[in-house]
């Protein structure tokens, strides 16, 4: 049976993610902060919630920045929400925080005064929104273009390499909702909270060989 390591650095919605992975038959799901267990896993999931400064402080304290760079090179790897944002170069949250730098780009604040069709939009962006699929990636298998996923975020990703944007969203501004590079895939939305489409994405991840 394959193993899926859900990285625990104290800042993620870990049990919801693990339960969703178990629900789709992903194999043996381990919530762990043990580097050796993470290295031995067949697949790795990197969730995250909260302030990026606190997340990156814990990631660096545990040495997980180097570990994430290592394990995401040679096996299917999924970043979720702030776990996705931590993979970028830099976030302007908390007066500016350097991140892991696996994907080029910046994490930016939606800002006050966000307007769409004459209406003021609330920040954080919270609720269901469409994701426009840019390419035919294996993790989109059996998920229709413009399927709706569940988002909760005040900061959005401005990708530095548009070829890595495999899904985009719009909330006053266009933003990267999904990024991919080799065996790495990352999403701004919460698949574990996104019902049918989110579970399908996790099922696709569980079956993916990491090639694209």
From Swiss-Prot:
CDD domains assigned: GATase1_IGP_Synthase
Catalytic-site annotation from UniProt: 81, 190, 192
Organism encoding this protein: Pseudomonas fluorescens (strain ATCC BAA-477 / NRRL B-23932 / Pf-5)
Protein's job: IGPS catalyzes the conversion of PRFAR and glutamine to IGP, AICAR and glutamate. The HisH subunit catalyzes the hydrolysis of glutamine to glutamate and ammonia as part of the synthesis of IGP and AICAR. The resulting ammonia molecule is channeled to the active site of HisF.
GO biological process: L-histidine biosynthetic process
Keywords linked to the UniProt accession: Amino-acid biosynthesis, Cytoplasm, Glutamine amidotransferase, Histidine biosynthesis, Hydrolase, Lyase
E.C. code: 4.3.2.10, 3.5.1.2
Any GO CC annotation of this UniProt entry: cytoplasm
Catalyzed chemical reaction(s): 5-[(5-phospho-1-deoxy-D-ribulos-1-ylimino)methylamino]-1-(5-phospho-beta-D-ribosyl)imidazole-4-carboxamide + L-glutamine = D-erythro-1-(imidazol-4-yl)glycerol 3-phosphate + 5-amino-1-(5-phospho-beta-D-ribosyl)imidazole-4-carboxamide + L-glutamate + H(+); L-glutamine + H2O = L-glutamate + NH4(+)
Compartment annotation: Cytoplasm
GO terms for MF: glutaminase activity; imidazoleglycerol-phosphate synthase activity; lyase activity
Predominant cellular place of this UniProt entry's protein: cytoplasm
Pfam families to which the protein is assigned, alphabetical: GATase (PF00117)
Domain spans labelled Glutamine amidotransferase type-1: 3-212
Protein name as catalogued: Imidazole glycerol phosphate synthase subunit HisH
Pathway: Amino-acid biosynthesis; L-histidine biosynthesis; L-histidine from 5-phospho-alpha-D-ribose 1-diphosphate: step 5/9
Stored NCBIfam families: IMP_synth_hisH
Assembly notes: Heterodimer of HisH and HisF.
């Amino acid at each position: 049976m394959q193993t899926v390591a859900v990285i625990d650095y104290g800042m993620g919605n870990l049990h919801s993610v693990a339960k969703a992975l178990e629900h789709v038959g992903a194999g043996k799901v381990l919530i762990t902060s043990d580097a050796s267990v993470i290295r031995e896993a067949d697949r790795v999931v990197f969730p995250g919630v909260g302030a990026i400064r606190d997340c990156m402080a814990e990631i660096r304290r545990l040495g997980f920045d180097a570990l994430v760079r290592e394990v995401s090179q040679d096996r299917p790897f999924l970043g979720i929400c702030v776990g996705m944002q931590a993979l970028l170069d830099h976030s302007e949250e908390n007066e500016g925080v350097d991140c892991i730098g696996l994907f080029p780009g910046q994490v930016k604040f939606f800002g006050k005064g966000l307007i769409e069709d004459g209406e003021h939009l609330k920040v954080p962006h919270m609720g269901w929104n469409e994701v426009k699929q840019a390419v035919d990636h294996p993790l989109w298998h059996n998920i229709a273009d413009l399927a709706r996923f569940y988002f909760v975020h005040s900061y959005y990703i401005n990708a530095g390499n548009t070829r890595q944007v495999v899904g985009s969203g719009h909330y006053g501004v266009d933003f990267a909702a999904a990024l991919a590079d080799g065996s790495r895939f990352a999403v701004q939305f919460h698949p574990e909270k996104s019902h049918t489409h989110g579970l399908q994405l996790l099922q696709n991840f569980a079956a993916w060989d990491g090639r694209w």
